[in-house]
């Protein structure tokens, strides 16, 4: 960008700074204001960073800001402003743009800003600029805390940030073209820091306990100083060439010499370059071309060995998302004087600063005083300086701060967190992989330091090492770490250096673990097992036994006498009977159904004492709702209750079917199965070979082979680690067949034909060993050649070596039974007969007819696929398991249909008929709620006009079903409710079946709540209702009013189930699931009705206005059998007995019940104060008697103005 293309205001501001003349900078009178204007311009730049680019093109920092910094240091306001502007101008490009842009235009701006930053770094590589910064920083640090102002602290932080920004600028390798031992710009910058004394100030900040607030800034600066260095090289500077280094260099030179000699020999065997016009063509026998004929070769015979079918072909382009990760870290050897300075800095830092600085940084990290990802600098410093300490003069005391079990745990936790985030955050997977590499290096150095402590002559150091190893080998997390890292290795995100470090760290860990096991007789380690329970989702089925009323009556006759005797025995104890399963994962509150089933099973089995004891014990555990009878129940009522339980149809759950171990790898294909994992911690004796077997899998072997492909670039130690691990798997475990893979054999062929193969003696020896084992096996098993094409697991390896079918012949009782020919014929017949039946699960039908050998659903499905009757197991997935997202067009269509039919009697029914994408009613209701088109589910209920005329009374059964039962279509909506709501509905249904109409009245509920100490919440509820009635009289409009509890006592009352039951009886609406939080007073209740509800909460009002309930008439003769009539009347008899005992039934009920019902006007409907769902269920039971029963609870007459609820 040219200077003359700058913005006019920006150009005028830069011109007002001053000018440089003869090495002296003359500032203008408005210099300070101009600097502040530039800061303000930078604050309002656009996303292309135009102001930053224009200032970089004009070289403002080189021509104006640096001279002002060095020559006008006495002008403190101007100096502070220039430092602020420099910090802003030099901030990293990644920080400016957020990330490396993918758009070409924005990426161009990113690279342009990076180019200007590299120019700034070159301008700062002078002793003069860093001298001014060092002097200023020294003067500020000399001030005590009582004399240091807030501006001084800000200036210290800005100077440290400026040094950090300058060091952070990456080097331009293409422009510099520096080689090792040559001074680069970064080396010149480090030398300027050394000459200015800035390094001494950094050491002071690191060691001072009073300056710990700058610890993270200092650690970041130090990490940037050493980012291109290797700690082993720095430790050996100035000590002459070691014998190990000389031998390594000689080996490298020998490899190069051997390859050069081989190339010369190959060139000598070739003919001259002169072309022979009579060279002719050759036919290569045994090598087929595309047309199944022998290949015709048109070149000289000396080129035949270089022939390949791929010659002339365009190489296949690898997609960008599948390309291997690139190496980002670059290591180079700096000039000698810089390396000497860095070595001395490291030695002094380790001796005086490492422990206090790392302790302060760790404290900041644990207290969350640091910024995000600052722990990466902590782990880099740990890896670098611990490696330098090992290579220089090993002194464990210098690194004692990071040599503990807590440090191992900290690094392991971060390493685990990084690879989990790499799997979840795919967009930033490369960044998480780099952090993961830093954590792995830190873990590697921790293990290397502990291993070095084993060789220390000091007994105390060796004892410390033994304690640390005992802890890390005991914990399962540290042993499983490397297995997890190998399984999660992905070459798209992890570079080759990460795999190299992982292989070397695993080799070190296994060597330490093996030596530790040998030094001890037996090693006890922690073992965590995940106990997997495969449980079918709750599938309700009918009662396990189907008996006629006559059989039930005969069974009850045999039980009645025994039950009556047991009920009258006072010594019947219930202390030893527990009606719930304490070890079950289902909460105790939700086990009432199972308790009822257990009572029924005891009655069916003829165990009268156990059934009675279970009933009484269940009554004590679940007293709410009187589902198992009231606490003061009489023996006669108890007998009637047991009879109802015996004849009731109770929901049962299907027993979970255990799957076989043969198909464990295909468990994920069954979406209807849940996997519940329970971690069990125990101790066991550790066996090294058993642990080594965990590495015998194709995923880990594939990673080792991938690294072995670059054996020429690998170090000798890396190749040794690869060969050692593969030798452990092949020789120690006897799994040579695990390495019988064609790609590995091609690599062995390349290795054996390498001219420098003598330099890889260990790899060559191992390759010959594996090839010899393969050819020995191939002589016995001809299928081994085919097995070369595939990666193998341990079971395939065993079959290859011991014979195919050896696993089936073993004594494995957990394997699935073999299908006989008769069973296969029956399976085929059943599948062909039922596969085309609509609305039927063909697998469930087959399972119901297969009685000879018990089979699982998974076994049947996989055998159908093996027989060729089905293409895939996915053809048998159960319906309704996948959630299909709504598209924008579908949402608009749903909104249009709702607006079209919202005034009709059946809104949901019309929508279901006309919607294009067919979905269940529950999904449509949920979407209507999510879009805000309706506020509650009841607005979508089908509207029915209920006419309570005398003609309706003639057919009591139909009229009652119309008045109290929900529409069957609405019941379908309940299937989509959450599990908790379904359980509540199931319990309510159970209570309705057993208890009948014996629910507590509002008066009894109020009295019970008063006895429980909830009088104050009742008064609050009464006042809220009166206040709502007053508001509706004043405003003249009605809307739902939430009941917001403001006191803790009222809030606890709103969570009380009995209090919530009272609210439902009073007509107060519960909050909609996922939409509302508080209970609400419905808008349909008028002020008069609200006052009446409030008055019903007072004791005196309840006694005066107590209504009477007529005694139900017996059923019409001839319509019911005696047993059915007895089953219907039994709950009513029990209820009447309880009411007579409580004094709630009056003689005049029978006379006034029918008259009260007939006095209801035609345009009014009878609304029970109880909740609609429970009333519908209980009303359905009452309809069996053929008469319309009026509940005793308090009722309210509500005008039916527009619609029925």
From Swiss-Prot:
Region span, Disordered: 651-676, 942-997, 1092-1205
Keywords, ordered alphabetically: Biological rhythms, Cell cycle, Cell division, Chromosome, Developmental protein, DNA damage, DNA repair, Mitosis, Nucleus, Phosphoprotein, Transcription, Transcription regulation
Modified residues (Phosphoserine): 281, 1073, 1086, 1169
Modification Phosphothreonine, positions: 1088, 1174
Induction note: In both brain and pancreas, no circadian oscillation was detected.
Family: Belongs to the timeless family.
Subunit structure: Monomer. Homodimer or homomultimer. Component of the circadian core oscillator, which includes the CRY proteins, CLOCK or NPAS2, ARTNL/BMAL1 or ARTNL2/BMAL2, CSKN1D and/or CSNK1E, TIMELESS, and the PER proteins. Interacts directly with PER2; the interaction with PER2 is via its second PAS domain. Interacts directly with PER1 and PER3. Interacts with CRY2, CHEK1, ATR and ATRIP. Interacts with CRY1. Interacts with CLSPN; the interaction is required for leading-strand replication. Interacts (via N-terminus) with TIPIN.
The record's note on its domains: Residues 1178-1195 comprise a putative nuclear localization signal; nuclear localization is required for the regulation of period length of the circadian clock.
Any Pfam family: TIMELESS
Region (Interaction with PARP1): 999-1097
GO cellular component annotations of the record: chromatin; nucleus; replication fork protection complex; site of double-strand break
Tissue: Expressed in all tissues examined including brain, eye, lung, heart, liver, kidney, pancreas, placenta and testis. Highest levels of expression in eye, lung, liver, placenta and kidney. Expressed throughout the suprachiasmatic nucleus (SCN).
Gene Ontology biological process terms from the UniProt entry: branching involved in ureteric bud morphogenesis; branching morphogenesis of an epithelial tube; cell cycle phase transition; cell division; cellular response to bleomycin; cellular response to cisplatin; cellular response to hydroxyurea; circadian rhythm
One Gene Ontology molecular-function label: enzyme activator activity
Region (DNA-binding domain), start-end ranges: 813-951
Region (Required for nuclear localization): 1081-1205
Residue numbers spanned by region Required for homodimerization and for interaction with CRY1 and CHEK1: 1-309
Chief subcellular location: nucleus
Biased composition (Acidic residues): 657-676, 965-989
Signal peptide per UniProt: none
Source lineage: Eukaryota, Metazoa, Chordata, Craniata, Vertebrata
Protein name: Protein timeless homolog
Protein's cellular compartments: Nucleus; Chromosome
Annotated organism of origin: Rattus norvegicus (Rat)
